[in-house]
């Protein structure tokens, strides 16, 4: 099948948006019932209709044991022409297990090309984004349902809400993406009792930081969560085998002229592990080919300075590669 790069139309008021649990299944647990209603309410405020796919609420145990059910929901969403967007419920750690059920399904591959959708999610959804890149669909490493749309405060975080508006018709007007004035701590209480409470927040004192040279750069974005990339590229196991079998990671040529975006998860990987995955990306020719790099803010600013030191160390051999640190995307809030 000839792959043609496709970009979905922006979402319009009245559009249906599918919610899928492609990794972790917590959306189907009783302790997440309030997240469903909050997410539905927020989507309605954007003028969008939430469609829960058949297996999205089957819970952690069932979805862990049945990756084919998770894949089935994604296939059904692409087969349904009335669905215009797809939003991931949350991340996890085994999205790679869906690859055999998706990449070996000719009808799914055809639907991705013929029925492009706005697809958004982050973290372990990196696997989905890399898969869709291979299949020629432009996707968005952005908000998911539980973390962002179902924010327990009375409103979504303002910066995140503005970002989500860019998925809507008329919302994607070119404009500077500035550093958020504030950053927010991860919650420790996600229960219904926390509804209406605000996150602890701090004034942003760093803003965007240049790791290497300070110069303008441009290119198409490609990247994801470093924790997932580590499992796919460095750690020996089923994740790495699946990545190699399906050619998930882009070839060296694909990185030519790109902007690499990367960020770390809530697990706060040790700086030594960060260095390993960066060196692996370098070994694969990524750092030599790209035009620049965007690095996400570490959640809760844990290892903020240590990570910065690792980037400086690894990138010492690329003094002319512009790298911007502390960008608002991924696991940090906003």
Protein language model regions, located:
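Conserved anion/nucleotide-ligand pocket segment
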Residues: 138-227
